[in-house]
Amino acid sequence: MIENWHRGFVLHRREYSETSLLVDFFTEEHGRITLLAKGARRPRSPLKAVLQPFTPLLLRWSGKGDLKTLTKAEPASLTLPMQTLALYSGFYVNEVLARVLENQTAYPELFQHYLQCMTRLATQPEQIEPILRTFEFQMLKALGYGVNFSICAATGDPVSPSMTYQFKENEGFIASLLRNNASFLGKDLLAFEQLDFSDKATLQAAKRFTRMALKPYLGSQPLKSRELFQSILPNKLKSG
């Protein structure tokens, strides 16, 4: 039985019965954990307003089985104020984490990166793309995705900024004359290593890489948050 307070965020919530919710949390000490929030759908439930995304929470739960029961949830601080594009970006991060994190496996460093990511999305909405790419690379590292961006996987030679490299899943980057969707310039790979996305071309290459790298983790089912983001983006650009 667990009775201590734990820091966490809501990743996803879904109906469990007429009155309750199943809630996926990302917690500092236990990683992703699904808890039964009894009565959380009732109009007067104190949990109803608390169990919202982007709100730093203090949580307590109990139970011995796989599905434990949430016994207490309190805001640790104010909900992070997300503007439109930042809001959908936050939903994207939450949806990806809900899919890729192992159940009840601690990712303490990634939890800190998540907190930094959410804070930056709320305070630097003009930097959404670099913020997302940075977190995706940090997430891949936490998942054990061991790609070396500074060494050619075939020869062991240092990556040359002027050469082109082909990405091979489960191997790494190999020097190649081929030019296709899996090709990357050495200068971009070296920037990936430093999480430096200040160059626009590097930023675009980083997005291309993370989509390929995350695909095995995410599976074939489309991300709902990505579809929502793509649907609101044209209207946002027109009004902006």
UniProtKB/Swiss-Prot annotation:
Pfam families: RecO_C, RecO_N. The keyword DNA repair applies. Gene3D superfamilies: Nucleic acid-binding proteins, Recombination protein O, C-terminal domain. One of its GO terms (biological process) is double-strand break repair. One of its GO terms (cellular component) is bacterial nucleoid. Involved in DNA repair and RecF pathway recombination. This is DNA repair protein RecO. It comes from Actinobacillus pleuropneumoniae serotype 7 (strain AP76). The lineage of its organism: Bacteria, Pseudomonadati, Pseudomonadota, Gammaproteobacteria, Pasteurellales.
